[in-house]
């Protein structure tokens, strides 16, 4: 019981960090509107920005957008098109509504907390639940995640795991614009067990810390975004063997203090974007 409570508290804390507005703002969070221009994703997913970002339409029959008060629903047009494709197909196959979490800020850039990536307009968090009934405005502003992983962290919780979660993740992975989908290792383990002979899509599904209630979907660099830095391809194979097993091995405690890291220099085009914005104020 104690372990279960710890798991619930950990999930709640994670959700609080992701949605907190009390942290000090970064310069990027002070820019309220996209920069006009031909859409261009610049830099890397964890050190970049975007010109010509577009807001995801907040009204759709197939998806709902959460925490709109935080204005994290901007992205490259390719990302908006992916969300439309995903939600349309998932609605057709499951009758459920896709819940869209954080995308990016109006010009991308670094968050003060919650995300290291989501900076170049090509990342989106999709919650791993598909409600048949539309959520109210209050539910969308204060969404309640469902922790799909049990207290041990070794397996999904069978009481809350649903087959349509596999459908949701697989549908996203089969999209040609998607390069990676980050989920909790226990969720990846469950997907490996359910996949059967059709396993190629599992290559894109990558185990990562947390991600107990949502998947983080990342798209490839758009062909015409010449300053976008592509991530290397995932390793060959379904990722269900030794690589996945390593996530469940006991971690050896380190005797060394963690090194303090400083953010890398911005790509020149992103620094210029910031400079122009604040010079005009």
Swiss-Prot record:
Keyword Zinc: yes
E.C. no: 3.4.24.-
Gene3D superfamilies per the UniProt record, alphabetical: 3.30.1380.10
Pfam families: Peptidase_M74
Biased composition (Polar residues): 246-255
Top-rank taxon: Bacteria
Molecular function terms from GO: metal ion binding; metalloendopeptidase activity; serine-type endopeptidase activity
Cofactor note as given: Binds 1 zinc ion per subunit in the active site.
Location(s), subcellular: Periplasm
GO biological process, one term: proteolysis
Residues in the signal sequence: 1-24
Region annotation Disordered: where it falls in the sequence: 230-271
Enzyme class: hydrolase
Cofactor requirement: Zn(2+)
Disulfide bonds: 49-270, 192-240, 221-228
InterPro entries reported in the protein's UniProt record: Hedgehog_sig/DD-Pept_Zn-bd_sf, Peptidase_M74
One annotated Gene Ontology cellular component of this protein: outer membrane-bounded periplasmic space
Binding residue positions for Zn(2+): 115, 118, 125, 216
Keywords carried by this UniProt record: Disulfide bond, Hydrolase, Metal-binding, Metalloprotease, Periplasm, Protease, Signal, Zinc
UniProt family annotation: Belongs to the peptidase M74 family.
Function: Murein endopeptidase that cleaves the D-alanyl-meso-2,6-diamino-pimelyl amide bond that connects peptidoglycan strands. Likely plays a role in the removal of murein from the sacculus.
NCBIfam families attached to this UniProt entry: PRK09429.1
Subunit structure: Dimer.
The protein's name in its UniProt record: Penicillin-insensitive murein endopeptidase
Species this protein is from: Pectobacterium atrosepticum (strain SCRI 1043 / ATCC BAA-672)
Chain's gene name: mepA
């Amino acid at each position: 019981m104690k372990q279960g409570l710890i798991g619930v508290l950990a999930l709640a804390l994670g959700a609080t960090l992701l949605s907190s507005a009390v942290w000090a703002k970064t310069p990027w969070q002070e820019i309220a509107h996209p920069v006009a221009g031909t859409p261009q994703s610049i830099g890397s997913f964890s050190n970049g920005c975007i010109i010509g970002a577009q807001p995801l339409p907040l009204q759709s029959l197939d998806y709902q957008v959460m925490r709109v008060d935080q204005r994290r629903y901007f992205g490259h047009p390719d990302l908006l098109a992916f969300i439309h494709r995903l939600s349309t197909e998932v609605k057709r196959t499951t009758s459920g509504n896709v819940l869209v979490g954080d995308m990016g800020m109006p010009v991308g850039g670094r968050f003060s907390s919650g995300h290291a990536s989501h900076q170049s307009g090509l990342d989106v968090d999709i919650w791993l639940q598909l409600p048949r009934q539309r959520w109210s405005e209050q539910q969308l502003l204060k969404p309640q995640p469902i922790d799909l992983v049990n207290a041990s962290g070794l397996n999904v919780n069978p009481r809350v795991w649903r087959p349509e979660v596999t459908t949701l993740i697989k549908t996203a992975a089969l999209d040609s614009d998607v390069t990676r989908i980050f989920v909790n290792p226990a969720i990846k383990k469950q997907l490996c067990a359910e996949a059967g002979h059709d396993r190629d899509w599992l290559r894109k599904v990558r185990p990562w810390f947390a991600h107990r209630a949502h998947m983080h979907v990342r798209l490839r660099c758009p062909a015409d975004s010449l300053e976008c830095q592509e991530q290397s391809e995932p390793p060959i194979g379904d990722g269900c063997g030794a690589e996945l097993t390593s996530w469940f091995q006991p971690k050896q405690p380190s005797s060394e203090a963690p090194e303090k890291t400083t953010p890398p220099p911005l790509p020149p085009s992103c620094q210029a974007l910031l400079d122009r914005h604040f010079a005009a104020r």
